[in-house]
Amino acid sequence: MLPSTGRHRRTRTLSIAAAVACAAGAGGVYLGLSTGGAQAASAAVTVSTTAQLEAAVKNATAGTVIQVRGGTYYPAATLKSTANGTSSAPITLRAHGAEKVRIDGSKLPAGSWLAGIYGDHWTVQDLAFVNSPAQGFVATSSVGGVFRNLITADNGDSGFTLRGDGTTGNLVQNLDSHGNYDPAGHGQNADGIAVKFGSGTGNRITGARLYNNSDDGVDLWQFSSPVTIEHSWAFGNGENRWNDAAFEGNGNGFKLGGGGASVAHVVNNNAAWDNTLHGFTENSNTGALALNRNTAYANAQSGFYFATGTARLGKNLAVGDKGGAAKLGSSTVSAGNNWDSGIATPPFRSTDATTAYGARRADGSLPATTFLTTGSTTIGSTMD
């Protein structure tokens, strides 16, 4: 117990009615309890204007829940926060109920990100980040983030980015990232999702659709800790859809390294098709990458390119890739793949990708499809 100061400390209580009145100017209702200022108040706010959204993100603290009403919002500056939530009181930014929310960067200054989070334990879900002059959504050195059911589309650089040292324990679930293109770099930088220039364990990408981006679907350039990627699709990346005469987009589905990092990323049950370079590539990563039950189809170069490292490939399926099923180095371990001796290639139920572009299921997971499915329980992606 702290020694008495000789003064009687008076606890101040704010009535619910007063709290509502105070919060009205910020466009929402905040309800919280505080004990003499010793404990941070939890807060809930519903916003319906761009100014309210900007203020709510700027002023968020642990436990804040920001619910955004349906509509399109045009920030005048990057939505930015350095605030930290906690594992028990995350900061939440989400759509209100099932309402559709677009956060549009078309009024931002040149070179601006649309959203930038520099704190820990954020949950961001059910929002679209579109038309940024640069990156759509960036989380820097974040811990324990949950980024769910997001759309990052038609931005001027990568749609979704995790970066920085200390990027730890983040979940990216059910992301749709498409149409991102960087005109300043002639398409060589804009990926669907980039986890790059950093480190930190426990980061996972699941249920993503990464398509029609100018560079790669996934890019893990210079990220020095293992990332897990599962149940995700990368397709149509690297094609010059912007009539750029000096276009330089790469066009890998899953680029799993580069820049000197040697990392054992884990890549399970994914699919890559119609990319302008490789379906899956080490991209000079010499680490013990593990790839199991992935499918590559109709990519312009190799389905699987692992020519220099120590990757372990098992039960993968490659069909119709113009540069061949796989290009492997002497240190690559390959077993149970359809290019290995004695392994049959099961037929696809469908090669019509139309349903892969369809609406996601009610829980946000990938759409049901027979595209590239085989019914096999031993080889290739299950496409779900």
Which stretches of residues belong to each language-model region?
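N-terminal export and membrane-targeting signals
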Residues: L2-V20
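Right-handed parallel beta-helix
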Residues: P90, H96-E99, D120-N131, V143-G156, ...
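Acidic Gly/Asp/Thr-rich repetitive segments characteristic of extracellular carbohydrate-active
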Residues: A41-L79
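Right-handed parallel beta-helix/beta-spiral solenoid domain characteristic of secreted/periplasmic
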Residues: T46-S48, G70-A76, A83-A134, Y181
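Post-signal peptide N-terminal regions of Sec-secreted extracellular proteins
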Residues: A41-A44, K58, N84, Y118, ...
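C-terminal region of N-terminal signal peptides and the immediate post-cleavage residues
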Residues: G6-H8, A26-A44
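Acidic, glycine- and Ser/Thr-rich low-complexity intrinsically disordered tracts
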Residues: A43, I193, G309-D384
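Extracellular beta-strand/beta-solenoid scaffold signature
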Residues: T78-S81, G105-A115, N131-V138, D154-G164, ...
